Amino acid sequence: MLFDRMNERMVQAMIEALPVEVTVIDANDEVVGWNKHEERLFKRPLTSMGMNFRECHPKESLDKVLQIVDEMKSGTRDKARFWIDLPVNADGKKHKILIEFFALRDHDGTYLGCMGQHKTFRILESFRTKSVLCRWKYC
């Protein structure tokens, strides 16, 4: 693996610096980690660590997530992607949220768990309402 030379502190810093929120469950469906604890869109208490994700996942989308995880475990799916509109501020204005799930597998293809990630595209919403000139060299 190309990350073998990284120490634990560096790996943790890298995970926190990712421009997405990440949650990981293991092969037994237990929540084993997440990043960006203080600033998450989908906040969760620390007591969620070690819980079966079914106990702490929003009921509205649980059936779909169960289907995705079951398909990942059976090997018929490796990823899933969808968008939702979600109010993220007190003003109630909805923002586009990209949600993706990725099967975690070892080099033999054995299912190790699932990584879910989500990202808000608030900055894209502002581009719709403003005329923005490209100031970047590589636009």
Positions of the model-derived regions?
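Generic signal for short, ordered secondary-structure residues
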Residues: 1, 7-8, 17, 32, ...
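Short, contiguous hydrophobic alpha-helices characteristic of membrane insertion segments
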Residues: 1-2, 10-11, 52-60, 134-138
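Sensory modules in modular signal-transduction proteins
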Residues: 2-30, 34-39
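Juxtadomain coupling helices with adjacent low-complexity linkers
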Residues: 4, 8, 119-139
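Sensory/regulatory domains in signal-transduction proteins
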Residues: 37-127
